[in-house]
């Protein structure tokens, strides 16, 4: 551990690295506090901060020669086969680590690789290459299966622990598997942190962007007080502030043959209201809507918009244009609404729900991977990051208030490389609730812009349903407003 005074140069380096964000670290008293320049406190500077050679230091760090936590079940013939770009990542990692060892720097690397790159299989290859006992830490149990599959393919002895770190510690007294796959809440147990710090050399933090290391979390404390010998952060959307804990980054661009289209489903709605809607509208400008909770609640009861989403999905699915669909909402009640209506239309053999409150959901996800046609309805929280269904070909985004990191992760669910190349996303920028009309339009525009500018999607307008739906007849004034609405939306984009 490095307890240092917060001198100007150190503070400036940290501030630059975090893009000017507030910096919080543990001080010499063990308090997690905001760092101020010229503070009289000494601060615990994370080991991974020094992994970059651009950070000047006289500190000397331990190397792998000081430990003997080697994998016993390694079999070189079981190493996974990698694509050329994945092999390039491995080559970069090995080259960087040689330099780190030579310079006596911490062996900490962030693998910033696009969604669908194959971070899991690439990291398993590196794990087998290093031959060191490994802890794989995931943010939720839904990610366990994809790691289990790849670790088993490499032939490594492993143990999975989802519930009850105390029972795991008892088992570890008699056996110490080569690979531990655990959920991050295990790191709240100090005895477990001490154990893996002593008996395991490599720590892999999957989906590292899901942790804000500027908060006093279990992962933050573990990396500060029980830093592993080697560490990988895996992410497609890194948090700038997390670089303080893992300051060496490898980012190799991925070229894709996927044909990616984002359909903007424009529609003009007559104003819609109910007593419930009028009650929630009163809360839009209050503190209870700070995180747009009521904005999303209003969307969930926007019946005309919900019906448009259903009509579009049903039309596309029945036509065979799309076959393996992910429907994403922000709120659980919104998810349940779509699930029940789709279940009535297509039945339980086709429609599935990704419910965080159902313990059987991970098993259900495994079972639908082999299906040719299905509709999977879930929430952004549960399926927005790390959902492992590579065959997904389409995504319906029913919510609107999503930050850039979540957008990129969500769109990545349909950007996995498979033999089928067409990928389609549907967004719905309109609402029948006039009080949130422009707000929703702006939020959805952010999704469209990021998908086109950063992720290579092609934007298209979708009007099949509105043009063919006999219920869409309207008065001349309504038609005029519809035209003006479309012009406004197109100019906005």
Curated annotation (Swiss-Prot):
CC terms in the record's Gene Ontology section: virion component
Key words of the record: ATP-binding, DNA-binding, Helicase, Hydrolase, Late protein, Nucleotide-binding, Transcription, Virion
Residues of the Helicase ATP-binding domain: 100-256
A Pfam family of this chain: ResIII
Documented EC number(s): 3.6.4.-
GO MF terms held by the record: ATP binding; DNA binding; helicase activity; hydrolase activity
Binding site for ATP: 113-120
Major location (coarse): virion
Xref: InterPro entries: Helicase/UvrB_N, Helicase_ATP-bd, Helicase_Restrict-Modif_Enz, P-loop_NTPase
Motif (DESH box): 206-209
Localization in the cell: Virion
Known function: DNA helicase which seems to act as a postreplicative transcription termination factor. Involved in ATP-dependent release of nascent RNA. Forms a stable complex with single-stranded DNA, and to a lesser extent RNA.
Subunit structure: Interacts with G2. Might be part of a transcription complex composed at least of G2, A18, and H5.
Assigned protein family: Belongs to the helicase family. Poxviruses subfamily.
Protein name per its UniProtKB record: Transcript termination protein A18
């Amino acid at each position: 551990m490095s307890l240092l005074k917060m001198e100007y140069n150190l503070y400036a380096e940290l501030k630059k690295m975090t893009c000017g964000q507030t910096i919080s670290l543990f001080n010499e008293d063990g308090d997690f506090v905001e760092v101020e320049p010229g503070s009289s406190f000494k601060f615990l500077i994370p080991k991974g901060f020094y992994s970059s050679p651009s950070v000047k230091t006289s500190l000397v760090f331990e190397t792998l020669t000081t430990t003997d936590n080697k994998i016993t079940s390694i079999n070189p013939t079981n190493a996974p086969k990698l694509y050329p770009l994945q092999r390039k990542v491995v080559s970069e990692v090995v080259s960087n680590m040689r330099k780190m060892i030579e310079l006596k720097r911490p062996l900490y690397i962030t693998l910033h690789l696009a969604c669908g790159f194959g971070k899991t299989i690439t990291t398993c290859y590196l794990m087998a290459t290093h031959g060191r006992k490994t802890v794989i830490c995931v943010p939720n149990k839904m990610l366990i299966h994809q790691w289990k599959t790849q670790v088993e393919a490499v032939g490594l002895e492993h143990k999975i622990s989802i519930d009850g770190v105390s029972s795991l510690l008892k088992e570890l007294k008699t056996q110490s598997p080569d690979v531990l796959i655990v959920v991050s809440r295990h790191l709240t147990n100090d005895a477990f942190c001490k154990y893996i710090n002593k008996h395991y050399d490599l720590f892999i933090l999957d989906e590292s962007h899901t942790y804000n290391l500027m908060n006093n979390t279990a992962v933050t404390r573990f990396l500060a007080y029980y830093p592993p010998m080697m560490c990988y952060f895996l992410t497609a959307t890194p948090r700038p502030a997390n670089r303080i804990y893992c300051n060496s980054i490898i980012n190799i661009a991925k070229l894709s043959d996927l044909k990616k289209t984002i359909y903007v489903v424009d529609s003009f709605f007559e104003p819609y209201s109910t007593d419930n809607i009028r009650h929630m509208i009163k809360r839009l400008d209050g503190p209870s809507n700070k995180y747009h909770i009521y904005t999303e609640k209003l969307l969930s009861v926007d019946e005309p918009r919900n019906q448009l989403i259903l009509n579009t999905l049903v039309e596309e699915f029945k036509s065979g244009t799309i076959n393996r669909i992910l429907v994403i909402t922000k709120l659980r009640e919104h998810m349940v609404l779509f699930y029940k209506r789709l279940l009535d239309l297509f039945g339980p053999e086709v429609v599935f729900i990704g419910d965080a409150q159902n313990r059987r959901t991970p098993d259900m996800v495994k079972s639908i991977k082999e299906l040719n046609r299905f509709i999977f309805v879930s929430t952004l929280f549960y399926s927005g990051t790390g959902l492992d269904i590579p065959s997904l070909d389409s995504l319906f985004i029913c919510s609107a208030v999503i930050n850039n990191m979540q957008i990129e992760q969500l769109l990545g669910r349909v950007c996995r490389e498979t033999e089928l190349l067409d990928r389609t996303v549907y967004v719905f920028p309109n609402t029948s609730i006039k009080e949130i009309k422009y707000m929703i339009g702006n939020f959805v525009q952010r999704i469209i812009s990021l998908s086109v500018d950063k992720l290579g999607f092609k934007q298209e307008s979708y009007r099949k349903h509105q043009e063919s739906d006999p219920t869409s007849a309207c008065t001349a004034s309504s038609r005029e407003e519809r035209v003006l609405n479309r012009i406004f939306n197109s100019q906005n984009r």
